[in-house]
């Protein structure tokens, strides 16, 4: 790659890993970047901005600003491939309402039901999230297979609030019309907006509530949304679903053949670091 700088990023509370990596990189040019525990700390664009101060443009990738980001699983698999070991397994965390939360190495193509069995089964009447609690997708179909992008399987009681927030309803527009005050808290706490990408969920809510798509605001802002879900699961004081309004707007633009312009329109928010959401506060809200 011809990289001039190599950085390993991890959360500072992983003290064992920090100690091991500090010893491993001693005497090399590799740096450690120790992050506080906040959401979404592992987002690649957030990492690029936090470490380099550069914003990846709308529709772009880290390479557009001279960076390559690889997670630890990818780096491990690269090492396996260089050693001639075929990479046919995926590390998947099984958690939530299960008997024994576990991380397993599962072959690509393994039914999700087998992963649930490895965790001792679900406790009570549950639905499931493939992926993380905020960005993952709801499913009741555990016959689907592990793929190269599968990272987690969560068992969630059907009456848990997170299930309602991840469910799309035709009533969402009616509720938005009645309850959304346009306080813009969803926009103020948006990580991508803070990086200068002009993501404005409150305008997507305005368009949804009024039925007027011309009110969605900056089209590039719609395409810059990473669907982290922070606006829905934490920012909105009325329990509304701004991320779903953004999803609807993005899907409609894509169906019309609209494409983003690769650019960064605005300067990053000077208070970016102060807008980071501590993980423990998010978990408290999700529970």
Predicted features along the sequence, with ranges:
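Hydrophobic alpha-helical positions that pack around
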Residues: 7-112, 118-123, 132-134
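Phosphate-binding glycine-rich loops and their immediate beta-loop-alpha structural context
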Residues: 1-15, 179-181, 202-205
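Active-site gating/interface segments in enzymes
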Residues: 38-42, 46-55, 125-187
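A glycine-rich phosphate-binding loop feature that marks nucleotide/adenosyl-phosphate handling sites
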Residues: 11-13, 95-97, 129-139, 249, ...
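Short, surface-exposed connector motifs at secondary-structure boundaries
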Residues: 1-7, 98-100, 185-187, 230-232
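Flexible, glycine/charged-enriched surface loops at secondary-structure junctions
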Residues: 3-9, 32, 88-89, 123-131, ...
């Amino acid at each position: 790659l011809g990289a001039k700088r190599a950085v390993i990023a991890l959360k500072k509370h992983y003290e064992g890993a920090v100690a091991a990596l500090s010893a491993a990189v001693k005497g090399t040019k590799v740096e450690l970047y120790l992050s506080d525990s906040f959401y979404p700390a592992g987002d690649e664009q957030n990492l690029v901005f936090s470490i380099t101060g550069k914003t990846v443009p709308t529709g772009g990738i880290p390479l557009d600003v001279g960076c390559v980001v690889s997670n630890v699983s990818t780096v491990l698999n690269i090492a396996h491939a260089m050693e001639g070991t075929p990479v046919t397994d995926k590390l998947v965390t099984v958690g939530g309402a299960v008997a024994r939360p576990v991380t397993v190495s599962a072959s690509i193509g393994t039914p999700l039901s087998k992963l649930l069995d490895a965790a001792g089964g679900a406790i009570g009447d549950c639905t499931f999230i493939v992926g993380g609690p905020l960005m993952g997708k709801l499913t009741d179909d555990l016959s689907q297979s592990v793929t190269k992008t599968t990272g987690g399987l969560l068992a969630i009681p059907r009456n848990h609030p997170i299930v309602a927030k991840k469910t799309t309803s035709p009533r969402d527009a009616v509720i938005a019309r009645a309850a959304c005050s346009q306080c813009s808290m969803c926009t103020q706490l948006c990580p991508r907006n803070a990086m200068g990408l002009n993501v404005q969920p409150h305008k997507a809510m305005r368009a949804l509530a009024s039925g007027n798509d011309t009110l969605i605001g900056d089209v590039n802002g719609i395409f810059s949304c990473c669907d982290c879900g922070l606006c829905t699961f934490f920012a909105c004081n009325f329990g509304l679903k701004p991320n779903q309004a953004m999803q609807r707007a993005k899907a409609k633009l894509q169906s019309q053949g609209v494409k983003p312009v690769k650019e960064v329109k605005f300067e990053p928010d000077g208070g970016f670091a102060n807008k980071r959401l501590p993980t423990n506060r998010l978990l408290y809200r999700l529970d």
